[in-house]
Each structure stands twice: as C-alpha cells, then as structure tokens.
C-alpha cells in the first residue's frame, strides 16, 4: 500500500511539475504579449474570479474529497456518483448568482473600487466562466478522491492553462479582454471533457441514498470560511494591492507569486495523492498510519523542494527578467515569497490533515485568526511600502498560519509534522 502511495506521489509530482512549467510559460506569454498594465488588469480579474468561485462552492471541496475517498476505498461507486451529483447541483445557484452580480456591477467594481475602468469588460467576460469553473473544480476533486490522480491534475492544472497558452501563441491576442475570452472558453471546454471523462472512468454502481443537503452544508460551511480565509493570503493580497497600488504592481506581484508556487507544488502533489488515504485511515481509526504517512510525505516534499528553492533564491533576477526587463526590479519580492513557500512545505500537509479527520471546526477557527491577521497586515504594509510590503505581509501571514496549524494538529491528532526526522 505504501509503495502504491509513493508511486502516486511521484506521478503527482511529475504532473504538478509539468503544470507549474505550463503556468510559468503562460505567465511569461501573458506578461510579454499584454505588457505590465494589461497583464495586471487580467490578473486582477482572474483573482476576483477565483475567490468568487471559492465562495460559490460553499466549502464543499474537502467534504467531497473526504467522502468520495471513503466511498472509493470501499468500492461504493454508487455513493460516490450520488454525492458528486448532489454537490454539483448545490453550487449551480450560488455560482450563477455570484457570476451574475459581477457581470451586472462590473463597471462599478472596476471604476470605483480599483480605479481601473478598463477592467470592466474583462470582469464581464470572466463572470461567464464562474459557474463552469465551480463545477469543473468539483469534478476534479471527485477524480482525486476516486484515486484518478492523473485525470484530476490534467483537467484542473494542465488543460485550461495549456489551451490558453496555445491560443496566445497562435492568435493575435493583445488585450486582457481577448485573453479572458479564451480563458473562459478553456474552462467551459475542460468542464465538458471532465464530465464525459467521469462518466467513462468511474463505475456506475448502485445508487445509494443521497446525503441530505443540510448534512453536507453543516459539514461544509466551516470549510467555506477556511477556503475564503486561505485565499485571503494569496488572492486577497492581489486584490488589496490592486486597490492600493494599481495594475502595474499587481502584475509584478502575481508573476513573482506564481514562480514561488513552484516550490510548494510538491505539497499540492502530495496532497492530491495522500488526502483520500488520510480520510480512509481516519475512518479506520488508524492514527499511527496517518502519522507514518504524514512524516514520509514531509520528507518526500523537502527532498524535491529544496533544490527548487535554492535555484529561485540564488538567481531571482534572472528568473524574473524572463517575463520582461521591467520585472527584474521585483526580484526581491520573489525571494521573500520563496521563503514563505519553503515554510509551507516544511510544516507538511497540516490543513489537509485536519480537514480529512473531521476537525473542520478547529481548522476554521485557526485559519480565521491567522487570516484576519494576515489581511490586516497586508493592508497596512501595502499602504506603507507598496509591493514589497505586500510580499512581506503575505509571507508572514502564510508562515504564521502554517506554524499555528502545526500546533493545532499536534493538539488534536498527536502528530508533530515538523519532527518528521524522528
């Protein structure tokens, strides 16, 4: 079993590394083709879309992941299918409402909040993708829970940016609006492929009695707040920086942020492979198995992350100059963000551990404290020091959140994720 999980982790890492490379290349293409201002407008619109989609999913991500993981581990495919159908129906209405509100008030948001009137049409096009992105995310999470790791990563992290990157290279795209139209098409197309892929790949099984919406919401609402506050560390920083400084600074921050995320793609890859197993082990009351898996995963992540961290930290100017000569000036931002991502990896899969072991209330409370602290710090330091302040604040917030969660995991599960060498 452990050998199988290691194999899945290696496959996940390779695929996530591929998706990181694609994201890096697409970011290079976007910044070079659109320029700093237009790419900044695109990144602001994208950030608002991601946080809107997060809200629309009602915190169902980890609920779906955990329950599908348990169902698939016991070969109860009818229950897994029934659960996916229920959760997808639940997100249709809120995602359409959120998308509709952004479309309706796109000019007011662009002109009055961000002081970027040209952002209006970009937001309008982004709003069309929100319902499809919400449904696509749930499908990819269901694939992950069913141990179809390859499909989950391909459909969530490789196909959409891949389509966008090819279109940017082939088509005469010069504006954020045109880029957004292609992005929305890539999401809709990938959703259709994902839905058909789920039907083909997953056995039908006997449909089990549907879990009530009330039960799912009681479990998911604490995780909704966790998801929103977690996004506040990354997406929230982009939005706040956009309001205070404008599109040019956003473009530099997002570029550095996306590069630094290459370090923690190992964490994402391991979580994709291990999360369903954590849920199954907890359902069997096997805490020693969870501890062993947690320690081995942290060692694996560090082994792969440290070389990436060293390259990005030693050669930041060279890495950032690839996006354009004007981006080399923000190389210090990349270094700051890289240290935060290294802390993220060193503390292990603390959030996933709590979410997969029915500690979502504790997770919500912990993330609320650190999330509010982080957002306040981002506002203060962004206003005082601009781009550099935003990078410092978001990095301190991410490090504080992960170290706090280490304490929470130790208290509730008896596992100290940073003593993995023992």
Task: List each model region and its residues.
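Hydrophobic alpha-helical transmembrane segments
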Residues: 124, 153-201, 369-373, 387-411
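Interfacial/gating helices of multi-pass transporter permease domains
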Residues: 30-51, 120-121, 215-219, 223, ...
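Interhelical loop/hinge segments that connect adjacent transmembrane helices in multipass membrane
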Residues: 1-5, 176-182, 192-234, 277, ...
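Helix-loop junctions and terminal segments of transmembrane helices
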Residues: 58-74, 145, 260-285, 291, ...
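Signature of the first transmembrane helix
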Residues: 4-62, 99-103, 221-247, 379, ...
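Helix-terminus/linker motif at the lipid-water interface of multi-pass membrane proteins
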Residues: 24-39, 110-113, 231-262, 281, ...
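Membrane-interface junctions at transmembrane-helix termini in multi-pass inner-membrane proteins
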Residues: 132-155, 338-369, 409
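Interfacial segments at transmembrane-helix termini and the short loops linking adjacent helices
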Residues: 106-126, 247, 295, 314-342
């Amino acid at each position: 079993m452990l050998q199988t999980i290691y194999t899945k982790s290696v496959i996940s890492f390779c695929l996530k590394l591929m998706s990181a490379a694609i994201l890096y290349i697409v970011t290079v293409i976007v910044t070079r083709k659109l320029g700093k201002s237009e790419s900044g407008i695109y990144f602001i619109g994208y950030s608002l879309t991601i946080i809107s989609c997060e809200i629309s999913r009602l915190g169902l991500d980890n609920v779906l992941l955990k329950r599908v993981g348990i169902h698939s581990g016991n070969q109860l495919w009818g229950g897994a299918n029934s659960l996916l159908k229920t959760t997808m129906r639940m997100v249709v209405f809120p995602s359409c409402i959120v998308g509709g509100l952004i479309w309706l008030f796109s000019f007011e948001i662009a002109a009055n909040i961000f002081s970027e009137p040209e952002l209006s049409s970009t937001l309008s096009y982004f709003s069309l993708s929100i319902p499809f992105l919400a449904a696509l995310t749930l499908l990819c999470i269901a694939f992950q829970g069913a141990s179809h790791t390859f499909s989950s990563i391909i459909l969530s992290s490789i196909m959409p940016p891949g389509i966008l990157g090819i279109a940017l290279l082939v088509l005469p795209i010069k504006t954020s609006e045109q880029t957004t139209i292609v992005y929305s098409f890539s999401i809709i197309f990938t959703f259709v492929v994902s839905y058909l892929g789920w039907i083909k790949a997953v056995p039908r099984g006997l449909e089990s009695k549907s879990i009530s919406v009330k039960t799912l919401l009681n479990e998911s609402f604490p995780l909704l707040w966790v998801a929103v506050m977690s996004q506040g560390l990354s997406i929230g920083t982009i939005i706040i920086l956009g309001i205070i400084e404008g599109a040019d600074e956003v473009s530099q921050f997002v570029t550095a942020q996306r590069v630094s995320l290459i370090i923690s793609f190992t964490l994402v890859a391991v979580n994709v492979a291990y999360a369903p197993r954590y849920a199954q082990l907890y359902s069997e009351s096997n805490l020693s198995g969870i501890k062993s898996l947690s320690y081995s995963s942290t060692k694996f992540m560090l082994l792969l992350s440290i070389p990436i961290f060293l390259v990005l930290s030693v050669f930041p100017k060279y890495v950032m100059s690839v996006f354009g000569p004007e981006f080399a000036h923000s190389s210090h931002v990349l270094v700051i963000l890289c240290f935060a991502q290294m802390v993220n990896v060193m503390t292990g899969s603390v959030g996933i551990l709590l979410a997969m072991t029915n500690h979502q209330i504790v997770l919500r409370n912990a993330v609320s404290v650190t999330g509010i602290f982080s957002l306040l710090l981002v506002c203060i330091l962004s206003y005082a020091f601009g781009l550099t302040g935003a990078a410092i604040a978001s990095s301190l917030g991410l490090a504080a959140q992960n170290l706090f969660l280490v304490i929470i995991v130790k208290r509730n599960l008896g596992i100290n994720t940073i003593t993995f060498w023992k």
